Amino acid sequence: MPVSLVIDNRQKQVEIEQKLIMLLEKAVITSLAYEGWDPDYEVSLSFVSNKEIQNLNRTYRGKDYATDVLSFPLVDDTDGFPMGEEKLLGDVVISVEKAVEQAKEYQHSFEREMGFLMVHSLFHLMGYDHLEETEAQEMRKREEIVLTEMGLVRE
């Protein structure tokens, strides 16, 4: 079964077009494939405002500011799923408002920023982190490989 991306658009600042959804699905598929994971996962993706992501960041991470993306992994081990059962990889929450701001700041397209945030979040869902410098370098290297494969290079 192919990847399932369940979308919940809770913001009104930017219209989310089908082309963007397809790009984000490709980000999931490409990230999973790079890591050698089966593509048959469900990922929940919520588009929110800065205000909502700030509330979530405060609640779940104790950090009272708007961030760009939050990841909530639901999988530790891929061996524990019975045949045919839906595999829930996790939840991704993206502040579309923050993505617009960062695309302008980094002088690249909104689509490139959204693709980066999705790939970044996927690596968190697959167990990567960036608390230590060596972890951050490894995660960044993997993200750049996937983004390049998708054609989302820095402009």
Curated annotation (Swiss-Prot):
Enzyme class, first EC level, given as a word: hydrolase
An annotated Gene Ontology molecular function: metalloendopeptidase activity
A biological process term (GO) from this entry: rRNA processing
GO cellular component: cytoplasm
Alphabetical keyword list: Cytoplasm, Endonuclease, Hydrolase, Metal-binding, Nuclease, Ribosome biogenesis, rRNA processing, Zinc
Gene3D superfamilies linked: Metalloproteases ('zincins'), catalytic domain
Subcellular location: Cytoplasm
Chief location bin: cytoplasm
Keyword flag Metal-binding: yes
Listed cofactors: Zn(2+)
Pfam families in the cross-refs: YbeY (PF02130)
Protein name: Endoribonuclease YbeY
Taxonomic placement: Bacteria, Bacillati, Bacillota, Clostridia, Peptostreptococcales
Gene assigned in the entry: ybeY
